[in-house]
């Protein structure tokens, strides 16, 4: 007795289903775009921080509602630290004009960590959409990105200036546990080591607490 085998036709995926799956994959990759100096908290907020030059410590730049805002904060901080030599910026087209505002034509400005935080916060709030050329005027805090950043940088001259190149400043001033930085004997919670992620998870450090 010979058994006859019946061939079952293979199901061909429709072009519409394949195109929809590819589009969903591409949209998912867009949503998950990664920015330098930015990471996402488990509850959805985005935090930004930047490593201090030649150190294990990081400067805390704040917590933001969008990844783009946190990325702009990182760009501003990187320009404060490295000036015109800064590369690998998240938004080079925005950061070019930001560099001139921060330095005001001077490439040798040393800024304290607190001043860097202020400039980063102003850059993050300057525009809610990097691709948008207009800024909403409904909020008094967003009147003009240039004016906001100029005011922030001008205020920094009243801060205690901590040079990034002097040994008496925030270089080589770790405490015994290598967990926090101290500036002239004063604890500086906005400077953290790369091993202190638990410090951040205790709760957001509100940027304006240091103003």
Curated annotation (Swiss-Prot):
Record's keyword annotation contains Flavoprotein: no
Protein name as catalogued: Ethylene-responsive transcription factor ERF014
GO MF entry, a single one: DNA-binding transcription factor activity
Source species: Arabidopsis thaliana
Keywords: Activator, DNA-binding, Ethylene signaling pathway, Nucleus, Transcription, Transcription regulation
DNA-binding region listed in the record: 34-92
Compartment(s): Nucleus
Record-level GO BP terms: ethylene-activated signaling pathway; jasmonic acid and ethylene-dependent systemic resistance; positive regulation of DNA-templated transcription; regulation of innate immune response; regulation of pectin biosynthetic process; salicylic acid mediated signaling pathway
Ranges where the record places region Disordered: 1-32
The keyword Transcription is annotated on this UniProt entry: yes
Pfam families according to UniProt: AP2
